[in-house]
């Protein structure tokens, strides 16, 4: 069984407060894009989980969310035998694009189908939050408002058709470190999440992009100015808006046409600002 694990971007990312349990209360608009990892899942007679990945530095044991996801369902339903899972990574690692969470989500979907466990999407999502806050959304996919710690999801009208250019510089940003360095009282500009939802519902791509924002940006760009350079390059070459996704360091630009996106991608590659450059489009459920 082959499955695609789609990357996500944050069209809007706001953080409201830090909770007593240490987690942060967020409001985000999430969007899947047509950039994906590929998983191949097969049954095997011997018990256990055999995981392999195309990058040798990625762990293949319980430190990997794919392994955790498979073990979660197989233990709960006392599945007979085991599975062999091959993960082909194409989504950049530690990029703010939920690659690991999406891999885990695809694993839950795959194990459910392979062993005919009969779980609904909602039942899978309820279990997914045990693995990570982004995993339920990666099962749901499409355009969604995420609240709470990211686990409270409301599907919204699909974002207008558009093209997305991904540019990841050759640096990694720890999500934990990004949260720890965030000064909540010092946030100057909060994205207009409600206004963005209204624009999405009205099919107003330009209105939506004008309101986009990510409260992580100022602090992370202060540490890594190359992120701002990539943003500026995209916006000066046709992007309606370029923004950092999640806690970074990946930058994405929203374009109205593939021609504009392809032209900007060529210039970005030639600039050597980004190690990964990838042009794609949004993925909508409908």
Predicted regions, residues:
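Glycine/serine-rich anion-binding loops at beta->alpha junctions
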Residues: 86-115, 133, 240-255
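Short, basic/glycine-rich phosphate-binding loops at helix/coil junctions
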Residues: 46-59, 107, 202-212
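Residue-level signal for inorganic ion chemistry
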Residues: 11, 39-41, 66, 100, ...
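Conserved, helical-rich catalytic subdomain that frames metal- and/or nucleotide-binding sites
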Residues: 140, 145-241, 256-262, 266-269, ...
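Contiguous, small/hydrophobic- and glycine-enriched helical/loop subdomains that border
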Residues: 82, 104, 108-145
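Hydrophobic C-terminal alpha-helix "anchor/cap" residues
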Residues: 30-33, 128, 234, 268
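Short, conserved aromatic-histidine micro-motifs
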Residues: 122-138, 265-282
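ATP-binding N-lobe of GHMP and related small-molecule kinases
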Residues: 1-95, 113, 117-125, 147-149, ...
């Amino acid at each position: 069984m082959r499955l695609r694990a789609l990357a996500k971007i944050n069209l809007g990312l706001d953080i409201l407060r830090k909770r007593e349990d240490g987690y942060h209360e967020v409001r985000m608009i999430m969007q899947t894009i047509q950039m994906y990892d590929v998983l191949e899942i097969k049954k095997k007679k011997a018990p256990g989980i055999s995981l392999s990945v195309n990058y040798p530095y990625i762990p293949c044991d319980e430190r990997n969310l794919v392994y955790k996801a498979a073990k979660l369902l197989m233990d709960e339903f006392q599945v007979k035998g085991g599975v062999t899972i091959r993960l082909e990574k194409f989504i950049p690692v530690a990029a703010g694009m939920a690659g690991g969470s999406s891999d885990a989500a695809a694993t839950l979907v795959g194990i459910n189908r392979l062993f005919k466990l009969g779980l609904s999407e909602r039942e899978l999502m309820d279990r997914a939050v045990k693995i990570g806050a982004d995993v339920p959304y990666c099962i749901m996919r499409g355009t969604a408002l995420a609240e709470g710690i990211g686990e409270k999801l409301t599907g919204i009208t699909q974002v207008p058709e558009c093209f997305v250019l991904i540019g990841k510089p050759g640096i990694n940003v720890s999500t934990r470190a990004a949260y720890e360095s965030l000064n909540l009282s010092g946030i100057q500009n909060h994205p207009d999440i409600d206004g963005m939802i209204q624009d999405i519902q009205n099919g107003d791509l330009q209105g939506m992009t004008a309101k986009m924002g990510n409260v992580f940006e100022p602090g992370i760009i202060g540490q890594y100015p190359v992120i701002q350079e990539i943003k500026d390059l995209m916006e000066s070459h046709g992007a309606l808006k370029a923004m950092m996704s999640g806690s970074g360091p990946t930058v994405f630009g929203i374009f109205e046409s593939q021609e504009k996106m392809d032209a900007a991608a060529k210039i970005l590659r030639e600039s050597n600002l980004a190690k990964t450059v990838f042009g794609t489009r949004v993925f909508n459920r409908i």
